[in-house]
Amino acid sequence: MLTFHRIIRKGWMFLLAFLLTALLFCPTGQPAKAAAPFNGTMMQYFEWYLPDDGTLWTKVANEANNLSSLGITALWLPPAYKGTSRSDVGYGVYDLYDLGEFNQKGAVRTKYGTKAQYLQAIQAAHAAGMQVYADVVFDHKGGADGTEWVDAVEVNPSDRNQEISGTYQIQAWTKFDFPGRGNTYSSFKWRWYHFDGVDWDESRKLSRIYKFRGIGKAWDWEVDTENGNYDYLMYADLDMDHPEVVTELKSWGKWYVNTTNIDGFRLDAVKHIKFSFFPDWLSDVRSQTGKPLFTVGEYWSYDINKLHNYIMKTNGTMSLFDAPLHNKFYTASKSGGTFDMRTLMTNTLMKDQPTLAVTFVDNHDTEPGQALQSWVDPWFKPLAYAFILTRQEGYPCVFYGDYYGIPQYNIPSLKSKIDPLLIARRDYAYGTQHDYLDHSDIIGWTREGVTEKPGSGLAALITDGPGGSKWMYVGKQHAGKVFYDLTGNRSDTVTINSDGWGEFKVNGGSVSVWVPRKTTVSTIAWSITTRPWTDEFVRWTEPRLVAWP
């Protein structure tokens, strides 16, 4: 028999269910509200010195919800296919079709895990509301299964257009049969004529840059003009003029997207690949898969004109990493407070082509010990992350090595510094931007916020020298509001005057991101609570206004 309390409980539950159903499904006669804006934030989810323990894909799956809750909207994952060995970071590409599924190069798994774990990681990221970008390495192949005799000529390393020997035969590592995979997924076998050159003659144990001879053999063009022609980078260089190569790479692209359900690409070393290749390849893969496939290319040059040229030659089909901006951060961090902060965006993609700029502070190539080592000093990193995460220009990318640390070099995690800036981007960095880039040390900017994102708006200051203050405009809609420093670097507050201005402060060599203190309802109106030992409803909880945080 039902007790009185249980009858009351069931009655309220029925009423609550009825009201929720009415709210969710009954037409209101009003058009649906547009979704509130949400800033995109990418994370490069690896660094060079990760241990060879096959656990990264599992970590992605385990961390997906946490990362998404902080505002990360996309993960750039490392190359997922088999490299020259199990410990290969992924850029010594052996077999594009082996995602940790076949016993090749001494193991089934890659450095990061198995194919099944990779697919589970992607599914977990999607379930958490994040996209996944795959790292694509088409410049070269390494770890060949055998050698072939090839006619070749030596070229000058500083000017690859200059031949410095006669033609002679070399023994080149260019034979790729994939014995562990066989013909699964693809029966294509790579031979010497699918490549332009190598840097090793096995017969003489000689390291040179060799350009192959034969019908149609020459360095690809157009590529970057560094060293005369920068087609050749390492290993066996793919010949993007060979129709069989182009067809096979297009087939792989379609297979990869359909197999993994990834959402986009990070393209490695695009300055070394024929400029006309990727627009054609992307058009084909996007068409074949029916997915827009966001794409960012790595064109490593601090010369902004080279980046502009590439964007023009590729018709804006992809974004580019803003290497010039990274160089600005690096230089500022090493200048002991003498860098002119007014020039932080000068000659960068962030300024010149913001919609195609992927901004970053550091990456796996700029880490200590790497070929492009240019590690931004730790004191400056919070300033740099504030710059890319709270401004309107560019698509920012957070680096795994900054977020989690790099044990190999005893580099500590900056998670406690980066998290508040991620929250600033997630909740506050919206609306019209006003710049105050008018001082050699202290620069600032504000965002007015948008009505679709209640409580949004901010004021940011960074300085590479002494601390100080700036009067900055955040909008009259914020008049009377109290702003506090989300980073916790300052404990004071700022009250916005009737004209929408406030005097915001920053400590020396530091950053402050000022946001409006929120007033919000802390609980759902008329929520129902129960004692843990009974199923009776015992009280109503009134809504209450609290200052937050």
Swiss-Prot record:
The active site is at D268, E298. This is Alpha-amylase. One of its GO terms (molecular function) is alpha-amylase activity. Its EC number is 3.2.1.1. GO terms for cellular component: extracellular region. Ca(2+) 2 binds at D196, A218, D220, D239. Its cofactor is Ca(2+); Na(+). SUPFAM superfamilies: (Trans)glycosidases, Glycosyl hydrolase domain. Ca(2+) 3 binds at G337, F339, S440, D441, D464. It catalyses: Endohydrolysis of (1->4)-alpha-D-glucosidic linkages in polysaccharides containing three or more (1->4)-alpha-linked D-glucose units. One of its GO terms (biological process) is carbohydrate metabolic process. Residues 1-34 form the signal peptide. Ca(2+) 1 binds at D139, D231, D237, H272. The record marks D365 as: Transition state stabilizer. Binds 3 Ca(2+) ions per subunit. Binds 1 sodium ion per subunit. It holds the Pfam family Alpha-amylase. It is an enzyme of class 3 (hydrolase).
